[in-house]
Design a protein with these regions (language model features):
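Flexible phosphate-sensing "switch/lid" loops adjacent to ATP/NTP-binding sites
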Residues: 1-2, 9-10, 18-293
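Hydrophobic positions on the alpha1 helix immediately C-terminal to the Walker A/P-loop
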Residues: 15
Length: 293
């Protein structure tokens, strides 16, 4: 399991990709999972291309992980819940630009499209949704891109009100487990990438050998079973009745001590990054073998 210590740009996908690539080069059959993903249409143009080419709403991370691993699992199963964000038009907030900043920082307030895929025995059921009235509150250039995606994805998006967005995301979050269960046993090794700084991308997480917590320039490695126990403590103590979303990584890690702390070299330093990847893979394999012993 690869998790982030910060909300954005922790480097989860970079580390996950490096680990997957090294495992594949050593002959492992690697499966990948990005159960929940969010991407911004304005800042991540590759997500627009991916969505149009694959005819489903999908970001960069899931596509990169699938390509790196060589997995034949469908993108919908690798990434069953995808949320597309779009910048809002500041013209609607001129009397309260602080509200504009708050809305731009909120996933719920800036989400424009959503895909939920549910894996069943006979295949995958997919639905797309679009917060239709929010189209009027985003800049025209972004609106055209959103409308283009909506025309290219299948099934066509269902129009929803903003109030329906959060319940749908929570529904998709819980349902994403169906796809993970469907693909997990097909592979020798599973590499799971969480979203933002969430402690877990699944409502029920089991059988994790190792956890890699990523921050810019540094990673911390934890025993998977110990991590899961700490996650359960956080959930049991605070209780879901007081919590709308899943715990953050920091809430869990404050209860633990890492097995290893490794400096991450600058990615452009090819030799050092290659050594880092080999070292990381060795440690993860060793921890996994101990967990299964």
């Amino acid at each position: 399991l690869v998790v982030g210590l910060i909300t954005h740009d922790a480097g989860k996908t970079t580390v996950a990709r490096a680990l997957i690539s090294e495992l594949v080069s050593r002959g492992y059959r690697v499966g990948v999972a990005k159960p929940v993903a969010g991407h911004n249409i304005w800042y991540q143009p590759a997500s627009v291309r991916n969505s149009i080419e694959n005819h489903i709403l999908v970001g960069e991370d899931a596509v990169v992980l699938k390509k790196t691993s060589g997995s034949e699992d469908p993108l919908e199963a690798i990434n069953p819940l995808d949320i597309a964000l779009a910048p809002l038009d500041p013209i609607h907030y001129l009397r309260s630009l602080r509200s504009y900043e708050d809305a731009m920082a909120s996933m719920i307030s800036s989400a424009i499209m959503l895909r939920i895929s549910i894996c069943i025995e006979r295949g995958i059921n997919t639905a797309h949704y679009i917060v239709y009235r929010r189209l009027e509150r985003i800049p025209s250039g972004v609106r055209r891109v959103v409308e283009d995606i909506a025309l290219k994805v299948y099934p066509r998006p269902i129009a929803i009100d903003a109030e329906a967005l959060e319940p749908l995301i929570l529904e998709g979050y819980i349902a994403s487990e169906t796809c993970y269960r469907a693909i997990a046993n097909r592979h020798q090794v599973m590499v799971i990438e969480s979203f933002n700084n969430s402690a877990s991308p699944l409502a029920r997480l089991e059988n994790i050998d190792a956890v890699i917590a990523v921050s810019p320039g540094k990673i911390l490695i934890y025993d998977g079973l110990t991590y899961l126990k700490a996650l359960k403590v956080v959930l049991d103590v605070e209780g879901s009745i007081y919590r709308r979303w899943w715990p953050t990584t920091s809430e869990v890690l404050r209860l633990l001590s890492p097995l290893e702390i490794i400096d991450t070299p600058y990615i452009e330093d090819i030799n050092l990054f290659g050594e880092f990847t080999e070292n990381l893979t060795d440690k993860i394999i060793s921890i996994s073998k101990e967990a299964k012993a």
